[in-house]
Each structure stands twice: as C-alpha cells, then as structure tokens.
Design a protein with these regions (language model features):
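Acidic, Ala/Val/Gly-enriched low-complexity intrinsically disordered segments
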Residues: 1-3
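Histidine-centered, transition-metal-coordinating active-site segments
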Residues: 6-83, 97, 101-346
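Short alpha-helical catalytic segment bearing the HExxH-like zincin motif
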Residues: 84-92
C-alpha cells in the first residue's frame, strides 16, 4: 500500500508563505539536535502510518519540525520579538513519538496537555540550545512556555500562531489547498485587541475569514473523526502493552517514531498488532459493540477556531456575522462520541 512508503525525508517546506526567511538566531536553534528530532515526529499522531486514504493522498508528510518553524515565522512576522518567536519555535520540543497518542495513554484525551511537562527539561538538557539562548540574551524562563505569549498561543476558539500554522499546514499538505490561497489568508491578518483587550490575530475581511474557517472546520472534524479517535486509542493501548512488558520505556517515547516502531517490531506479538494497524483503511461505528472485534468508545479534545473579523462595527467573532458557520460549529461541538468504533482493513 502507498501508506507504507511514509517517510519524513519527503517533508515539504512551505513555510515561506509566512516569511521569506527567519532570523539567523532562530535558524541556528532549529539546527540543534533537540529540534532536529522533531523532523522524525509527525503532526498526525501516528495516524499517518495507517492506510487511510487521506494520508495516502497527502502531498507529503507533515512533521513537528516544519510546524515549529512555521509557528516561529508567524510569531516573528507579527511581533518581531525574538523571545516570543523562540518560544513558538520550541513549543513542541517535548512532543513524544505519536504525539497526542501519549495523552490518550495518560488518560488525557480531552485536554491533551500531559506531554507538555517535559518542555523545560528538554530545553535545559540541550547544551547547544542553552548556549544559543545565552548568546541571544535569552533565558530558559523566557522561552519554555509559549502560553505566556498570546500571539503564539491562546485559548480556543481564538486564533493564534500555533492554530494558524497547523490549519494552513494541513490545508496545503493534506487538503491540497493552493499556496496562493494560503498566502491570501496570511496577508489578510493583523494584530487587534480581543474582548479582554489582549492581542489576537484578526482578519481584515469577512470573505477571507470565510475561506479560512471552511478549512479550519474541515480540520476540526477530521481531528476528532471516528478514524482519528480509533487510531489514537489503538496506538495508546499498543504503547501501554509495550511499556508494561518492558519492550519500551517512557524515555524511548522521547526519541523518534522510527526508534519506537523498531522496538515494537522486535516483539512478535506487538509487531503483529502494529502490522494490523498499518492495514486499517477506515472505520465503522454503531450503538452496539460488535462481537469478536476490537472496538473503542472514546471522546477527544475538540479543537476549533472562531476568529475575530473587522466589521464596520468593530472586531466581531466570525460566528456573530456568519450564521452558516455558527450553525456548523455548533453541530460539531454537539457530537458526544457515544458510539462504538471498529476498524476496516485493506
């Protein structure tokens, strides 16, 4: 199957849509081993190793490294503050193999923040990164928590650099959205003050916000689809059993995905389950749990964006000026995930 040719070596860099180039300080930090590891950690939480058509048809894999560079570029473009841009660059530095699958493993399905605790220690344990921070006049405390900087990150459904980047990254690499459309979205954004008088990325024109929110909602639905939730729970249980049997350690999860996969393949029973995972082409669901099939009933964090848009009456949330989007977003948020989901294999 085409999905088996998955490789991060083909990762497409499209981040010049945000900025033609990054400051040298950021580029040097991106070259450190702790950041280079993220080239081998995917954005799709292990789902890209399945045979789902959406990944088979993707333009290229999408790594945490590409996402991190893009986030840093967006923050720098709107703030020209190195401290904030570095925090954006490093925000995923502690992402484990299969990313939010480890949150499922930790029982953190709904918040998906359990893996962020290592960010401080991952930066501190990198002599190369610490030296570059010192050379730039930055401290560890300046850059170890991008939540401090609202352009870099804020609470959903607000728009931040992080949410903007993965929305446009997926739009380009997975949904095949033309680069010109992405540039139009980026070019329409400006920094305004939200309801709490805090800086937030805003759209100047409702028609551009409409284009963006269509992409955003499509992504939101995909992130909590039956396929996605099933795959993440399947992998979480596989990792749990690998950890319980000593095939993996928690520290192994903070190497890269190929290392973790090699460990799984070293144990015959786990290897068979991994190979079954690679053959999943989709899912089915129902109220009743099927007899004789592995099935899950699991909820997940609903990510959504309701951006601010400039109107003649000031800045307003897009749901306040577009009833169609408001209805679709409400329907998305209403899903209670109260159904059993099981796999379809190739």
């Amino acid at each position: 199957a085409a999905a088996r040719r998955f490789s991060f070596r083909k990762d497409i860099m499209y981040t010049d849509i945000y900025l033609p180039s990054l400051p040298q300080e950021l580029l040097a930090m991106a070259e450190t081993p702790v950041m280079q590891r993220l080239q081998r950690i995917g954005m799709h939480c292990g789902c890209e190793y399945t045979a789902y058509p959406i990944y088979r048809n993707a333009a290229a894999p999408y790594s945490r490294y590409t996402h991190s560079l893009g986030t840093a570029a967006i923050v720098w473009h709107f703030t020209h503050d190195l401290k904030q841009a570095v925090a954006g660059l490093l925000h995923d530095v502690a992402t484990p193999a299969f990313a939010h699958v480890v949150d499922f493993l930790n029982g953190d399905h709904l918040r998906q923040e359990s893996t962020e605790g290592r960010t401080h220690s991952m930066i501190a344990s990198s002599p190369e990164l610490m030296a570059l921070l010192a050379r730039s006049g930055l401290t560890l405390d300046d850059v170890d928590d991008y939540h401090r900087y609202p352009i870099a990150d804020n609470d959903s459904p607000r728009l931040s650099a992080d949410r903007l980047e993965y929305t446009l990254g997926n739009a380009h690499l997975v949904f095949h959205c033309p680069e010109a459309e992405l540039r139009a979205i980026c070019g329409d954004l400006f920094v305004g003050k939200n309801e709490e008088n805090i800086d937030e990325l805003c759209f100047a024109h409702a028609e551009i916000a409409d284009t963006f929110t269509r992409l955003s909602l499509r992504q939101s639905e995909w992130f909590v689809s039956d396929d996605d939730r099933f795959s993440m729970q399947y992998l979480a249980e596989l990792l749990h059993d690998a950890l319980s049997s000593g095939v993996l350690t928690m520290d192994d999860l903070y190497t890269d995905e190929q290392t973790v996969i090699a460990r799984l393949l070293s144990a015959p029973a786990l290897a068979a389950r991994w190979q079954d995972y690679r053959r999943i082409t989709g899912t089915q669901s129902g109220v009743q749990k099927p007899n004789g099939s592995y099935a899950v009933k699991v909820a997940a964090k609903k990510r959504s964006i309701d951006p601010l848009v400039q109107t003649s009456g000031g800045l307003r949330r897009f749901t306040a000026i577009n009833a169609d989007y408001a209805a679709k977003l409400a329907a998305f948020r209403a899903d209670d995930f109260e159904r059993w989901v099981w796999a379809v294999y190739e």
